[in-house]
Amino acid sequence: MNLTNHFLVAMPGMKDPYFQNSVIYVCEHNEEGAMGLMINAPVDITVGNMLKQVDVQPVHPRLFEASLDRPVYNGGPISEDRGFILHKPKDYYESSIQMTDDLAVTTSRDILSVLGTEAEPSDYLVALGYSGWSAGQLENELVENSWLTIEATPEIIFDTPITERWKKAVEKLGIDPSQLSADAGHA
């Protein structure tokens, strides 16, 4: 089982309050563990304010200031000072991994200098920190019914309001969210 390019959708009975109601985009999953970014946990800072704090200068005039008003997200509890940009591929950046034809993850500062300019990706999400699992840990959490899994779609990441992402991911599985129980069971 490889959950790269899938969403982890927290079940109502999620024991860890940090991840309650979370939707996590899985960037990497292999025998060594897994790494992902929460896509529905905004923090109290905009992309524009973050760029000012880290003193990133644009490579082109910033013509699209409105795009900088979007929130920065809490990607997870690990390396919270490290940034990850989930975006639609447009250009090559120093440290990018193309996940699909429609989605890439970049960790290098060069992408920050194009945000708000004509060169920015058409859609993007900036996250600080990431969520990580050691070998076998995520698989154990799946057995414990902590997560639902579903193939990721850019529409849920970029086109769905933040407060609706959990619900939309559950509905994409064909499940009525009101029918999910916090009690785990095994048949």
UniProtKB/Swiss-Prot annotation:
Cellular component terms per the entry's GO annotation: cytosol
Cysteines engaged in disulfide bonds, as pairs: none
Coiled-coil regions, chain positions: none
InterPro entries: AlgH-like (IPR003774)
Record-linked PANTHER family: UNCHARACTERIZED PROTEIN YQGE, UPF0301 PROTEIN YQGE
Entry-linked HAMAP family: UPF0301
NCBIfam families recorded: PRK00228.1-1
Family that this chain belongs to: Belongs to the UPF0301 (AlgH) family.
Protein name as annotated: UPF0301 protein VP2612
Species the sequence originates in: Vibrio parahaemolyticus serotype O3:K6 (strain RIMD 2210633)
